[in-house]
Regions:
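C-terminal lobe and adjacent flexible extensions of AdoMet/dcAdoMet transferase-like proteins
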Residues: 128-130, 157, 184
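Hydrophobic/aromatic-lined pockets within catalytic cores
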Residues: 75, 151-154, 182, 186
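Extracytoplasmic electron-transfer domains, predominantly the class I c-type cytochrome c fold
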Residues: 2-131, 140-144, 150
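C-terminal low-complexity, acidic/polar tails when present
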Residues: 123-131, 135, 151, 162-174
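Juxtamembrane interface at the cytosolic side of transmembrane helices
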Residues: 161-191
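Juxtamembrane amphipathic/hinge helix adjacent to a transmembrane helix
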Residues: 136-160, 164
């Protein structure tokens, strides 16, 4: 998504975008928004490149729901290099970047035995260990807003494409009717 597109859809002026979203002087309003983190640095620091969640929003079925749940499912795990793990994406390399807002939570598991006698850990829920700077309701609202933005940023023209699609289908239906009538006219002498 481009800075200009965000400004247009959010009703922001060019100066508001430059002052609040563009953090380098060399950027122009028509350029794409990209991560400021170098993928090589991310691989060195976290063991893997950080995922682009806007692509996840577009490619996964129910991508918005997945991102929302993912951002709320980090828990403390001392065995991981980042100190956290995730219920939705186990052993993820991404750190919990929103930990100051959400706080720390512990995942509670119970052990169940299946019909074959194999034991499995089953997630039961989270327990808050340390409060963040936001209440749970505020954090939920903020994550919902972030998720909605990422879903929109994954395909900014989606609403326009869908609106235009009805006109295209309507045109094709009319064209089909005209082609059918023309075919009947051409073939009436043969039948």
């Amino acid at each position: 998504v481009r800075y200009e597109s965000v400004a247009k859809h959010a009703g922001l002026t060019e100066d508001e975008v430059k002052n609040n979203l563009m953090f380098t002087e060399s950027k122009k309003i028509g350029q794409q928004m990209v991560s400021s983190m170098d993928p090589n640095d991310a691989s060195r620091w976290f063991g893997t490149a950080i995922p682009d969640l806007t692509l996840t929003a577009r490619l996964k079925n129910g991508g918005g729901d997945w991102i929302y749940t993912y951002l709320k499912s980090f828990y403390v795990d001392d065995s991981r290099s980042t100190g956290v793990n995730n219920i939705v994406f186990p052993d993820v390399g991404m750190p919990h970047v929103l930990v100051d807002l959400q706080g720390l939570q512990k995942a509670n598991f119970k052990v169940e035995t299946d019909a074959d006698g194999n034991e499995h850990r089953v997630f039961e829920g989270f327990e808050q260990i340390e409060a963040g700077s936001m209440s749970p309701e505020e954090y939920d609202s903020m994550v919902r807003d972030m998720t909605n933005f990422m879903v929109w940023a994954s395909e900014p023209m989606k609403l326009e494409r869908q609106r235009l699609g009805y006109w295209v289908i309507g045109f094709l239906v009319i064209l089909f009717v005209l082609a059918y009538l023309l075919k009947k006219e051409y073939w009436k002498d043969i039948h």
